[in-house]
Swiss-Prot record:
InterPro entries: Toxin_16
Main location class: secreted
Protein name as it appears in the record: Lambda-hexatoxin-Hv1b
GO cellular component, one term: extracellular region
Secreted keyword on record: yes
Family, as annotated: Belongs to the neurotoxin 11 (kappa toxin) family.
Length: 36
């Protein structure tokens, strides 16, 4: 399956890649996958 890499916006289609998790929202209102 396709996963969302670190420092990319969290996408409903695709979980964050292993070792990262969805964090946010940031000041721009977007949540990003970040390294754990």
């Amino acid at each position: 399956t396709i996963c969302t890499g670190a420092d990319r916006p969290c996408a409903a289609c695709c979980p964050c890649c292993p070792g990262t998790s969805c964090q946010g929202p940031e000041p721009n209102g977007v949540s990003y996958c970040r390294n754990d």
